[in-house]
Amino acid sequence: ISLISLLGITLGMTALITVMSVMNGFQKEVRARILGVASHVQITSMHGKLSNWQLTAEEASKHSAVEAAAPYVSAQGMLSHNQVVQGVLVRGILPDMEDQVANFANTMASGQLDHLVPGEFGIVIGMELARTLGAFTGDKITLISPQGQVTPAGVLPRLKQFTVVGIFEIGHFEYDSGLVLIHMADAQKLYRMDNDEVSGVRLKLHDLFAAPQVVNELPALLTLDSFISDWTKQHANYFRAIQIEKRMLSLILALIIAVAAFNIVSTLLLAVTDK
């Protein structure tokens, strides 16, 4: 009986270590995938558009924890191809600066990020979105902007044809199916923004876990009134769900070990009583 009890607690401990290792690895992998394309810290304007982004990026980069900064334009849109229409989040970027804050270069299934050239209206889309639209590198697709044009016939949405110059596969459905990248200059033209206006500035930190502290310290360095957020708030629900799952698994496995330990104690008590 004692051997069986010992075997039970051994299996329980093995299960605990294995499951916790898998969950920790899963959390680390998910975090790496999400934060590979999302920002550690994000600076946006209180008024919707951030003017003079160069100043904001320069001031933020003075913080010792900041590794790189890059501007972006973010807006809603719809893509149309092969009579299929799909809503997307359009992100206008500067490819050379984006490489410093994101990991898109290592996720490209075809094409390259630096194929986004201002004025040529190229677009990089996710693998799931490409499958939905039936689009391949080199295809022409139509981007529909919700900011319409006023005509005698009424308000009409703005349409612009883009060429697919790349397809990325991050491994996260939300991004692979709903995010597209275009050059920031093309995004500014499409959404009628001035050359020095952007949606915000994205920051990459040397230590991503220092993000909450950096958010508290950055306002002292910035001249313009800005709203600053970090990845722990932007993706809080997702990582909180993983943490709750880890705790519940730990509780269940701890109960298994407790039962096995109780069996050992009971066996020892019986042995002592018999003697």
Where do the PLM segments sit?
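Short aromatic/hydrophobic contact patches that present stacked aromatics
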Residues: 40-42, 122, 200-202
